[in-house]
C-alpha cells in the first residue's frame, strides 16, 4: 500500500525571511495623508542577514517620519526613501555582504489621499522577482512589470 503525505503548511525554513509592514498616516501634509505598505522576502539567507528586511523597513519609515508638514509632493518623499534603500544596499554590497543579491524581493506601495480634491494617487516600486497585479474589470494586469527601485511607478 502506498501512502502519500500532503503538506499544506510546510515547515519554516531557517534561511527564508518574510516581512510585511504598513505605516498608516506616516506623512501628513497640508492637503494630504500618505500610507506606505511593503512586502519583502529574503531567501537562502545567512543568519547575519536575518534582520536585513527590518533594516530596510526602518529606513523607509524614518525617511517618511523625518519629513515635516511642509511637504508639498508626496511622490518626492517616496523617491527619496527609495534612494535611501538603494544607498543602503550599495553600502552592504561594498562591505562584502552580497548574500542578498538575487535572493531579495521587495515591493513598496504608497497611497496618498487628497480629500479636498477627492483623489488618491499611488506610487509603486519593486526589487527582485516579485509581481504586483491590479484587478480591474475582470482582468489582472501586472502593473509592476519592468519597474525597479530606480524607476518608480507613480499614478
Where are each of the predicted segments found?
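Conserved, helical-rich catalytic subdomain that frames metal- and/or nucleotide-binding sites
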Residues: 143-155
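N-terminal entry segment of metal-dependent catalytic domains or homologous docking segments
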Residues: 1-64, 97-125, 130-137
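Helix-loop-helix
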Residues: 57-98
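Intrinsically disordered, low-complexity regions
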Residues: 69-71, 103, 147
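A short alpha->loop->secondary-structure connector
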Residues: 137-143
Amino acid at each position: 500500500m502506498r501512502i502519500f503525505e500532503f503538506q499544506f503548511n510546510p515547515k519554516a525554513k531557517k534561511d527564508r525571511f518574510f516581512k510585511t509592514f504598513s505605516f498608516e498616516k506616516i506623512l501628513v501634509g497640508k492637503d494630504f495623508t500618505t500610507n506606505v505598505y511593503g512586502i519583502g522576502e529574503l531567501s537562502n539567507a545567512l543568519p547575519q542577514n536575518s534582520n536585513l528586511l527590518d533594516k530596510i523597513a526602518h529606513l523607509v519609515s524614518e525617511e517618511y517620519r523625518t519629513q515635516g508638514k511642509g511637504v508639498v509632493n508626496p511622490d518626492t518623499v517616496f523617491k527619496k526613501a527609495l534612494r535611501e534603500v538603494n544607498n543602503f544596499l550599495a553600502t552592504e554590497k561594498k562591505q562584502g555582504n552580497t548574500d542578498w543579491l538575487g535572493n531579495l524581493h521587495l515591493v513598496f506601495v504608497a497611497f496618498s489621499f487628497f480629500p479636498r480634491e477627492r483623489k488618491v494617487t499611488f506610487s509603486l516600486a519593486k526589487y527582485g522577482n516579485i509581481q504586483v497585479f491590479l484587478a480591474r474589470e475582470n482582468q489582472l494586469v501586472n502593473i509592476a512589470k519592468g519597474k525597479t527601485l530606480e524607476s518608480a511607478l507613480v499614478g
